[in-house]
Amino acid sequence: MIKFLSTFMLLLVTTVVQAERIRDLTSVQGVRQNSLIGYGLVVGLDGTGDQTTQTPFTTQTLNNMLSQLGITVPAGTNMQLKNVAAVMVTASLPPFARQGQTIDVVVSSMGNAKSLRGGTLLMTPLKGVDSQVYALAQGNILVGGAGASAGGSSVQVNQLNGGRITNGAIIERELPSQFGAGNTLNLQLNDEDFAMAQQIADTINRARGYGSATALDSRTIQVNVPSGNSSQVRFLADIQNMQVNVTPQDAKVVINSRTGSVVMNREVTLDSCAVAQGNLSVTVNRQANVSQPDTPFGGGQTVVTPQTQIDLRQSGGSLQSVRSSANLNNVVRALNALGATPMDLMSILQSMQSAGCLRAKLEII
C-alpha cells in the first residue's frame, strides 16, 4: 500500500509540473495594447539641457508653446537655454482602458541634452497611428542613472538621457472594442505548435462539450462562446484556468552573432562525431625606414622606404571525438571538452548541423 501511494504521489507531482494554464500559453485575439507617441519639452534641468544653437527645434518648440500661453518672444531673439530639452514620449494603451485611468510613460531625449535628471515634462499629447489624441502626459521624470563631471573628467552610471513617469499620462479617449459582439473568439498560441493547439482544443471540448473549440492552424484555436460581454468574460475566465499538459519543445539552438552567446534548450541532443577546430591568424607589420646619404655634400636625397612583414600562423586542428549525448548536461559537457571559445562554438555548431550530428534547429539572430 505504501509503495502504491509513493508511486501515485510521484506521478501526481510529475503531472503538476508538466501542466500549464491555458492563459499562460495563449492570448485572446483582438485583446492587445496600442502604442502611443508624442513630442514635448522637459524643463527644470540643472544646466544639462539641449544646446539650442545645435538643436534649433527646441527653441522653435518653446516659442510655439509660449505663444499659445500668450507670451510673444521678439523676433530675432537668440535664447541661450540650458534647462530645456526636447523629448519623445512613448506609452502603451492597454486593452479596455477607460477614460480617466493613468498609464506609465517613457521619456527619451531627442537632442544633445546631457541629462534629464530633475526635469519636469510639460503637458504632452500622446497620439496613436490614426493621429488622434488618446492621452495627455505630464509630470516629474525619474531617471535611474547618475553622473558627475569636473576638470575635463566625467563619471556616468547607467543612462541619463531617458526616464519614466509612473502614472504620468491620463487617458482621454477610449478605443472602440469588438469584444462581445460575435459568437466566436480566437485564442492565439504564444509559440506555434500543432500538437499544443490540438491539445488545447481537446481540453476545452472535454470540459464544454465537443464542438466548442477547433484548432484552425498551429497558432489559432477558435472557440464558440455565448453572446454578450458578461457571458464571454465568465466563459473565458473558466477556460483560461484549465490545465494543459505541455508537449516537449522543438530542439533549438539560438546563436547571437553580435554578442557571441549560444543558448540551447533541454531537447538538444548530439550524435557521435569528430571535430577539429584550428585558428588561422595573419599579422601584418609595416615599418617606415629612412635612408639618407652618408656624405652631406654627395648630392644624394633622403628616401623613406616602407618595410612590410607578414606573419602567418595556424594553431590547433587536432581531431577530437564527441560522444553521443542524450540530455542537456551531457551536451554541455561534450562541447566544453572541445575547449572552444563562444565564437568558435558558433562555427562548430553550424558544421555539426550540416553533418547531421546536431539534433536541433539552429537559429542565428
UniProtKB/Swiss-Prot annotation:
<keyword id="KW-0732">Signal</keyword>
<dbReference type="InterPro" id="IPR001782">
    <property type="entry name" value="Flag_FlgI"/>
</dbReference>
<comment type="subunit">
    <text>The basal body constitutes a major portion of the flagellar organelle and consists of four rings (L,P,S, and M) mounted on a central rod.</text>
</comment>
<dbReference type="GO" id="GO:0071973">
    <property type="term" value="P:bacterial-type flagellum-dependent cell motility"/>
</dbReference>
<dbReference type="GO" id="GO:0009428">
    <property type="term" value="C:bacterial-type flagellum basal body, distal rod, P ring"/>
</dbReference>
<comment type="similarity">
    <text>Belongs to the FlgI family.</text>
</comment>
<dbReference type="Pfam" id="PF02119">
    <property type="entry name" value="FlgI"/>
</dbReference>
<keyword id="KW-0975">Bacterial flagellum</keyword>
<dbReference type="GO" id="GO:0030288">
    <property type="term" value="C:outer membrane-bounded periplasmic space"/>
</dbReference>
<dbReference type="GO" id="GO:0005198">
    <property type="term" value="F:structural molecule activity"/>
</dbReference>
<comment type="function">
    <text>Assembles around the rod to form the L-ring and probably protects the motor/basal body from shearing forces during rotation.</text>
</comment>
<feature type="signal peptide">
    <location>
        <begin position="1"/>
        <end position="19"/>
    </location>
</feature>
<keyword id="KW-0574">Periplasm</keyword>
<protein>
    <recommendedName>
        <fullName>Flagellar P-ring protein</fullName>
    </recommendedName>
</protein>
